[in-house]
Curated annotation (Swiss-Prot):
InterPro entries linked to this entry: ATPase_NBD, Heat_shock_70_CS, HscA_NBD, HSP70_C_sf, HSP70_peptide-bd_sf, Hsp_70_fam, ISC_FeS_clus_asmbl_HscA
This protein's name: Chaperone protein HscA homolog
HAMAP family: HscA (MF_00679)
Gene: hscA
GO molecular function: ATP binding; ATP hydrolysis activity; ATP-dependent protein folding chaperone; unfolded protein binding
Cited SUPFAM superfamilies: Actin-like ATPase domain, Heat shock protein 70kD (HSP70), C-terminal subdomain, Heat shock protein 70kD (HSP70), peptide-binding domain
A GO biological-process term: iron-sulfur cluster assembly
């Protein structure tokens, strides 16, 4: 199969013109910025030669601090110090309050129900906080590179939905950045390893950061990067390890934090203990008047359920990719939390091989994003690399009977556009409602609604005569647009899917699993619904035919017989016996065959009345 070379928007017009571009890893705990210099992707350090910028913003009465300076204010002024804002972006206020009730911030709702954090500098949205972090990274980049940036590639977790992706782009625009592309974090890591280490074959990218977990199964071959399957958990990361240690300390000392400052101090101590346990067999935590020692074995026992949860997600991703674990040739470790020895040990046992850690797991995502940014601005015009991300959940449309017709199946590579034709259900129908859905189940009630719109202006026709073409298009950033067009008049309507908030953590992890758990029941429910829809169609057409021609073409006994069979089908349709409905449809079809033939003959006779044979032969 031939591969097409596709020029990306924003490429340099002149091949010799070098444009400044960077890759940004906008992380939950830390963020980094990288660029390609002299053909190599490198991390750009700040003025103190620090590569990691804590994803923290402090909004003081007189000044705003970003990064390490802000992090140092976390225990002193927690209400005005925003950390892990990536967990909040694209979420509703009720979702944030239910999921993160321990956060020290005061929240209010914006006009559209999104969370605003009350600070000394006024209410701040997660988009604004993220924008301040991006501004800091932009400043570091322009100071190091000595010029203005032409564009940036920003990485996001593979499981970020439309709302979270759009919010990330909005934050970048607020910071004055030209976003070339949003890139899935595991894909960026694979890109970095593919160029630096020359890996080919099936690769698993295990990405455990501060706040999110992602697993991607990729095929790398001759410069082509293809994501076969993805999985993830937007509420699993190193922060959760910290909270487990903190809870353990509370259990040991019987002392609970009484203030937000104490809570933040305890979390900081837990984080320091976790880092110590990476290299040492034990760590001492001094909390208030107590000192407790936690061993690496105790720590491993605490985090075991979370590590196991990540491996179950890996198992599902392998199944989606139709790949056995022994087929995986390499396992790439990404994210600072993969430094935990127990994580590396368990991942190695699961895949049956020692994970790759030759590139700093904290930096690999930013390095890969920088390579992609360099290509997108046209600095690497001879690149034959093709990078293919995927749709993580199927996208579909509601059809009659509450069924879901999948237009773009999950794990389809993006960007992608798919179209399908639909028709009207009733005679004279002049409008059609388009209900856009996301998920793997067969029924509308079991999937997530993304949006609705109505196509109006359909010419009145007989049921089934109109042709409405519905097109689903997902761009390179994973954002969806849907268009419906009536083919004869070209009248159309469309929608861009930008939900006001994202999936809850339970929904993200449960949607795919539920499709497996309920596969048999879903199939039976779909078949029953399809039979009911067919019964409705037959009933509707018979009623219309009886009203139009029954009195003229049928005897009284024939009319009553069809009515009786019709009522029997209407009754049996209310039940859940699929076979009985099918038999009822067949019985009504048999009962109306002679009636249908008479209607056809009457229609032909009417069309021929008053015409000569020559008129028919030579129209």
């Amino acid at each position: 199969m031939a591969l097409l070379q596709i020029a990306e928007p924003g490429q340099a017009a002149a091949p010799h013109q070098h444009r400044l571009a960077v890759g940004i890893d906008l992380g939950t705990t830390n963020s980094l910025v990288a660029s390609v210099r002299s053909g190599q992707s490198v991390i750009l350090n700040d003025e103190q030669e620090r590569s990691l910028v804590p994803s923290v913003v402090h909004y003081g009465v007189e000044e705003k601090k970003v990064g390490l300076e802000a992090f140092e204010q976390a225990s002193l002024d927690p209400k005005n110090t925003v950390i892990s804002v990536k967990r909040l972006i694209g979420r509703s206020l009720p979702d944030v309050q239910s999921r993160y009730s321990s956060l020290p911030y005061e929240f209010v709702a914006s006009e559209n129900g999104l969370p605003l954090i009350i600070t000394a500098q006024g209410p701040k949205s997660p988009i604004e906080v993220s924008s301040d972090i991006l501004l800091r990274l932009n400043h570091i980049a322009e100071q190091r590179l000595g010029g203005e940036l032409s564009g940036v590639v920003i990485t996001v977790p593979a499981y970020f939905d439309d709302a979270q992706r759009q919010s990330t782009k909005d934050a970048a625009r607020l910071a004055g950045l030209n976003v070339l592309r949003l890139l899935n974090e595991p894909t960026a890591a694979a890109l970095a390893y593919g160029l630096d280490s020359g890996q080919e074959g099936i690769i698993a990218v295990y990405d455990l950061g501060g706040g999110t977990f992602d697993i991607s199964i990729l095929r790398l071959s001759k410069g082509i990067f293809e994501v076969l399957a993805t999985g993830g958990d937007t509420a699993l990361g190193g922060d959760d390890f910290d909270h487990l240690i903190a809870d353990w300390v509370i259990e040991q000392t019987k002392l609970k934090p009484q203030t937000a400052n104490q809570q933040r101090e305890l979390i900081t101590l837990a984080n320091q203990a976790k880092i110590t346990l990476t290299n040492e067999k034990s760590a001492v935590i001094s909390w208030q008047d107590f000192s407790v020692e936690i061993s690496r074995e105790q720590f491993n026992e605490l985090i075991y359920p979370l590590v196991k949860r990540s491996l179950l997600t890996c198992r599902r991703a392998l199944k989606d990719a139709n790949v056995e674990s022994e087929e995986v040739q390499a396992v790439v470790m990404v994210g600072g939390s993969t430094r935990v020895p127990y994580v590396r040990e368990q991942v190695g046992e699961f895949f049956g091989k020692t994970p790759l850690t030759s590139i700093d797991p904290d930096k690999v995502v930013a390095l890969g994003a920088a390579i992609q940014a360099d290509i997108l601005v046209g600095n690497k015009t001879d690149s034959d690399m093709l990078l293919l991300d995927v749709v993580p959940l199927s996208l579909g449309i509601e059809t009659m009977g509450g069924l879901v017709e999948k237009i773009i199946p999950r794990n389809t590579t993006i960007p992608v556009a798919r179209a399908q034709e639909f028709t009207t259900f009733k005679d004279g129908q002049t409008a059609m409602s388009v209900h856009v859905l996301q998920g793997e189940r067969e029924l509308v009630d079991d999937c997530r609604s993304l949006g609705r719109f109505t196509l109006r202006g359909i010419p009145p026709m007989a049921a089934g005569a109109a042709h409405i073409r519905v097109t689903y298009q997902v761009d390179a950033d994973g954002l969806l647009s849907v268009t419906a067009m009536e083919k004869s008049t070209k009248v159309q309507a469309s929608i861009q899917i930008k939900p006001s908030y994202g999936l809850t953590d339970e929904e993200v992890t449960a949607m795919i699993k539920s499709s497996f758990d309920n596969a048999q029941e879903d199939l039976q429910a779909r078949e029953l619904a399809e039979q009911r829809v067919e019964a409705d169609r037959v009933i509707e057409s018979v009623i219309v035919a009886l009203q139009a021609d029954g009195a003229e073409l049928l005897s009284t006994d024939e009319f009553h017989h069809i009515e009786t069979v019709l009522k029997q089908l209407m009754d049996v349709k209310q039940g859940s016996d699929r076979d009985a409905i099918a038999q009822g449809i067949k019985a009504l079809d048999t009962a109306t065959q002679e009636f249908a033939a008479r209607r056809m003959n009457a229609s032909i006779n009417k069309a021929l009345t008053g015409k000569n044979l020559s008129d028919i032969e030579n129209p």
